[in-house]
Amino acid sequence: MEALRIYLWSLCLSLCLIIYGANSDPLEDKRALLEFLTIMQPTRSLNWNETSQVCNIWTGVTCNQDGSRIIAVRLPGVGLNGQIPPNTISRLSALRVLSLRSNLISGEFPKDFVELKDLAFLYLQDNNLSGPLPLDFSVWKNLTSVNLSNNGFNGTIPSSLSRLKRIQSLNLANNTLSGDIPDLSVLSSLQHIDLSNNYDLAGPIPDWLRRFPFSSYTGIDIIPPGGNYTLVTPPPPSEQTHQKPSKARFLGLSETVFLLIVIAVSIVVITALAFVLTVCYVRRKLRRGDGVISDNKLQKKGGMSPEKFVSRMEDVNNRLSFFEGCNYSFDLEDLLRASAEVLGKGTFGTTYKAVLEDATSVAVKRLKDVAAGKRDFEQQMEIIGGIKHENVVELKAYYYSKDEKLMVYDYFSRGSVASLLHGNRGENRIPLDWETRMKIAIGAAKGIARIHKENNGKLVHGNIKSSNIFLNSESNGCVSDLGLTAVMSPLAPPISRQAGYRAPEVTDTRKSSQLSDVYSFGVVLLELLTGKSPIHTTAGDEIIHLVRWVHSVVREEWTAEVFDIELLRYTNIEEEMVEMLQIAMSCVVKAADQRPKMSDLVRLIENVGNRRTSIEPEPELKPKSENGASETSTPSEI
């Protein structure tokens, strides 16, 4: 009895500690940042105060998983002014990322930064820092990326940089550094270096530096073999070794007459060219509206220049609008500089994976054919961004200008349900097991049900499909791309994949309803059960509509033929699959008023999952051999 009492007391104490830890702040780190903020006085307002929680609310601050320490501070372009006060930032001993770029910070490199032993990413570019660089960089053994460009640092480049075994990017451009360039050839991980426009750097250009682009060391004094200093400048256009005779003399004209003719012809050509460009521009405006750069100008990988991601910024005050509680702190310029990879092109635009300078990955959706004005667009974004639910992909920020509309989300590395179900059906494919498919179904149902409660129970997703459902770290389904039909131009009659998801009563995408969402969700359930796309073709090029096909197979009482062949290796799931099929079929009935509500579907699917028994894959049987061993039979696919 005494032992039981001690056990219960220990359990209560542990629970109290867990609850306290979940709601506690990294108090010492918090005090350090508040002191820093008080002295630096940023011109841009930050939501930092003593009463708010650091890890969940403070802009530009990221904590570790248990919320006990701050590991990243990102405050680019917030108007920080003056010298970094000692014993503030340096007290964040668990800090890994520090970005204070594009501010008005002055003074020398803070000596007490040596306390930041875990620092991996350091961005202090575009400030007014001066004085020598730290003598011993080896105290930051985890440094991966350093950018100190566009400051006033002087003195020599420390040779201790050669001991940064993990360094991948080093930018010291546009300072007043002097002396020889140290030997950094041992840095095998170094992928980018920029020492350009440090005009007092001297000595021969090392061989290891020549493997980098010429722009990495322009504007540096070098010593050629003759011993005289020469300024490294970009190579000029191809020069001719001898002077050619004047063209005027070939024509028998005086150079004055020839010059007048050239000027007259040039004026005519320029006038004609301007007329042609004006006509083309007007035609393009009539054909495309406001005119956004075409998608084929966007690279699938590589840096996104302003010309390739955002065509232009007409209003310099336009900037990314972040939602409260978002701990990201980057700006449009960061996105423009980020490396980008096209993840997919959907109904409402193209989605990119953008990797920022501190290795943070975000998903950026570039919308097309937005019909709403700025005010209506922003109101809809506020509704979408206000939804906080574990099964809804959270909108972190958005951007609106005349030519560009962007939405920023967290990046889900596991990809979409569509890619997991239909991508890579070859030998190396890792099939989705039944338990994961159930978690996807339950998660997506909860997410959509939460969406339907928003805006006084009137919000509609409008574009539910497997490519808009993602897997989180626990393999639960998370719904993305919600609420966009309200701001988009009406789509043409559906074709291809989109036709397979759209409810029969929907003729105008702007008039989608919650019951049409239910229909689309039912199609996703059928995808999970059959492994087939909503619109697919047979080997004979026959186009198959998934909903119609399932109806016909079930009507002929060949229900077993419906299910994905990859699910047949699991035992004890037949009853669950049949129940899920019945739920899916109730969602895709033609009469909208006969479909269940999403809240009811959550309960029905959870009931199926709660009755789950032990599910184990059956051992695979080898094909029948000559001695009579049996082989498994599988239903033929359409």
From Swiss-Prot:
Main location: membrane
Modified residues (Phosphothreonine): T360, T436, T509
GO molecular function terms listed in the Swiss-Prot or TrEMBL record: ATP binding; protein kinase activity
Biased composition (Polar residues): 627-638
Keyword Phosphoprotein among record annotations: yes
Swiss-Prot/TrEMBL LRR repeat ranges: 94-117, 118-139, 142-165, 166-188, 189-198
Family: Belongs to the protein kinase superfamily.
Name used for this protein in its record: Probable inactive receptor kinase At4g23740
